[in-house]
Amino acid sequence: SGKIFSEDGQFVCNISDTKKVEGEIYLHQLEKNEQKKITKGTKYVLSIDKERREKIRNNHSATHLLHQSLRKILGEHVSQKGSLVSDQKLRFDFTYNKSLTNKQIYEIEMLVNKTIRLNLIQTEELATVREAIENGAIALFGEKYPEKVRVITFNSDDNNLLVSKELCGGTHVNATGQIGAFKILSDSSVSSGVRRIEAITGEEVEKHINQKILLIEDIKILLKASENKIKERIQNIQIDYNKLKKGSAKKIIFSENEIINNDPQIYFDNTINEPS
């Protein structure tokens, strides 16, 4: 993504996406209704939206680390079924037949964040698909690859860490530390045997944590309780509510019986009269 300028520096329009086709051709997708601003045969200057690209780059590299973390925590039978990377978040679909437990989500996050903190260097190389797979790279099932493919690797000599090696043509960080931080927001079912994780990285993690802190502060004020007493306070409120609910139900039954006993001619008609 980025912007298009005239040769004299005047802004022309925005680029919403860029795709590489047939190996060497780059297609720039313009925002809606902006195609008419481009004139055939005219030279333009293209400018990358650096901040947005960096966020996309961070999220893209994070999907590779997430993929390997899932395989390490859940088992090597886990495989990628799809993904979506934007400047706001990442989405990763994978094969697994049940919901992730809180413990599994915690372990997956911890492993990805540990790899981020160690600032592992990214390396890339060109190879044939067969060479890449024979050397341990992961390829997407059913994906069509050119004769030569780009292999992205995040490696470490420590066997307890992630070793990510995948066929990929996208933009990536030079080292994992640039991702900053990683946080899983949700785990949900997409279809039978396929689950979806949505997650955020870097600055978005910081925003997410700050929002949670502010929410906790508001709850502390409402409950008039310290942070370590919030859970206990809510449990006590639930107990009081259930007692009140049971007491109210008993009072209603008692009142009905009292009315009937005092005047046997009174009865309760629950039918609804239709308007004439």
Predicted feature locations:
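A glycine- and charged-residue-rich anion-binding loop/surface
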Residues: S1-S276
